[in-house]
Regions:
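Pyridoxal 5′-phosphate
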Residues: 1-291
Length: 291
């Protein structure tokens, strides 16, 4: 019997061609750390990490290579952003469709004095964009929202919300867990200040690798939640302030980054627009068949 996998909202399967080979190649033939040694294999692994950052910049139309931060998952990314950027007295707006990766950290910082309000949605799950401006307060710092819901499939109008953020000088923080790799996302055009992603869903990479792309202004204000060894300025006991070291302490998931790079190569070759069109065709066919 042929297996039909329908759980891609949780994690993609199968992964992109070449992903498992890339992970295995690192584990079997490379196996080094980065920024900790001055020999050929370590430099080669560092080159792969840099190339992966470059591919993420290209995919999301972002021009700050050093501001691409790797984390273990998008949940970690959102925790870093929410707990590192928001301060007591700040107010943020979120949609009423948010995942717990957003809401649980927000509920934690609420206990410390951060406030948030939920932008309502219609009964069909569409964001009520016309309500946003009347909800903005003098202390509103950002609008934070997912791009798409893995519960009902709602896709948020990022361009419209980004335009409102730009108009009111608010930061725009986007959870792209469900859409990075299957929807075109343009950070510059959409006025996105922070884009959080995971590697194992529509990016078609392995589990255990995620990250975020962050503007200089937000990165400067953020406090690193995890500090430690970075392989840089090791004679100092204080965390580096330069990027990406400010937010990348400890050993990276280098096998995961190797796998993610392979997935990004596949996405480049196939084209995000082609992938998106194919997914929309599949969605239409599914709806027609069950109607």
């Amino acid at each position: 019997m042929k297996r039909v996998y329908l759980d891609n909202g949780s994690t993609s399967f199968p992964k992109a061609p070449g992903v498992s080979d890339a992970v295995k190649n690192f584990m079997d033939n490379v196996g080094t750390n980065v920024n900790r040694g001055g020999y050929e294999e370590a430099y080669a692994a560092e080159d792969i990490i840099i190339e992966t950052r470059e591919k993420l910049c290209k995919l999301f139309h972002f021009d700050k290579l050093r501001n691409v931060i790797f984390t273990p998952s998008i949940t970690y990314s959102l925790n870093y952003i929410i707990k590192g950027y928001l301060r007591p007295g700040d107010h943020v707006l979120v949609s009423s469709m948010e995942h717990n990766a957003m809401m649980r950290p927000l509920q934690q910082v609420k206990q410390l004095g951060v406030e948030f309000d939920r932008i309502p949605c219609t009964r069909d799950g569409e964001l009520m964009v016309d309500k946003i401006e009347e909800m903005i307060r003098p202390n509103t710092k950002a609008i934070m929202m997912l791009h798409a819901s893995n519960v009902c499939g709602t896709v948020m109008p990022l361009q419209e919300v980004g335009d409102i953020c730009h108009k009111h000088n608010l930061k725009f923080i986007v959870d792209a867990a469900q859409t990075a790799g299957s929807f075109p996302i343009n950070i510059e055009q959409m006025h996105i200040d922070v884009l959080a992603f995971t590697g194992h869903k529509s990016l078609l990479g392995p589990q255990g690798i995620g990250g975020f792309l962050v503007s200089d202004e937000v990165a400067h204000e953020m406090i690193p939640l995890v500090t430690g060894g970075t392989g840089s300025v090791s004679d100092s006991e204080f965390q580096p302030e330069f990027m990406p070291d400010k937010f990348e302490s400890g050993t990276q998931n280098i096998p995961g980054i190797y796998g993610l790079r392979a997935a990004l190569c596949y996405l480049e070759e196939t084209g995000i627009e082609n992938i998106h069109a194919h997914e929309m065709e599949l969605c239409k066919a599914f709806i027609e068949k069950i109607d």
